[in-house]
């Protein structure tokens, strides 16, 4: 099981920031794996700074939830993602291991999106999540 933290950045037009890491084909939320002893929220803050040059304080984030899914780029691996959201206006810059970024409509069913986005996060954002 891979553990990650991520942030959903939502623009005023409802589009969500996604990134594609170098050497991969799937689009995912900005974020990444924790360092030893790091809290999920601190991981998310650190990763978006490293990947996109975005400085954001933990107080600016709201917990969307902790979700299980499938890793986008590591076949056969499970994923445990703690996901935060913010409507803070950001101007991301591609850095570190990020190759590209794009703002997407979460209602679109782009098959190049990571399973976490398609199966969990985007349905929550669009109000189409299945209720158990």
Give the residues covered by each predicted segment:
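Short loop/turn segments immediately following the C-termini of beta-strands
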Residues: 21
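The catalytic Nudix box helix
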Residues: 29-64
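NUDIX/MutT-family hydrolases
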Residues: 83-85, 93-128
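Active-site segment of metal-dependent pyrophosphate-handling enzymes
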Residues: 3, 53-91
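Residues at secondary-structure transition points
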Residues: 34-39, 74, 79, 98, ...
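A short acidic/small-residue loop/turn micro-motif
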Residues: 24-25
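Conserved hydrophobic "DFG−1" position in protein kinase catalytic cores
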Residues: 9-10, 18, 86, 103
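Conserved N-terminal beta-strand and adjoining loop/helix that marks the start
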Residues: 1-16, 33
């Amino acid at each position: 099981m891979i553990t990650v933290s991520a942030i959903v950045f939502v623009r005023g037009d409802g589009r969500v920031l996604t990134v594609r890491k170098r050497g991969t084909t799937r689009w995912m939320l900005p974020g990444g794996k924790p360092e030893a002893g790091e809290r999920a929220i601190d991981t998310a803050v650190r990763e978006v700074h490293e990947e996109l040059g975005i400085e954001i304080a933990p107080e600016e984030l709201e917990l969307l939830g902790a979700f299980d899914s499938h890793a986008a780029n590591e076949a056969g691996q499970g994923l445990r993602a703690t996901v935060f959201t913010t409507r803070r206006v950001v101007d991301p810059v591609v850095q570190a291991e990020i190759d590209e970024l794009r703002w997407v409509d979460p209602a679109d069913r782009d098959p190049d999106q990571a399973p976490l986005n398609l199966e969990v996060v985007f349905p929550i954002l669009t109000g189409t999540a299945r209720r158990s």
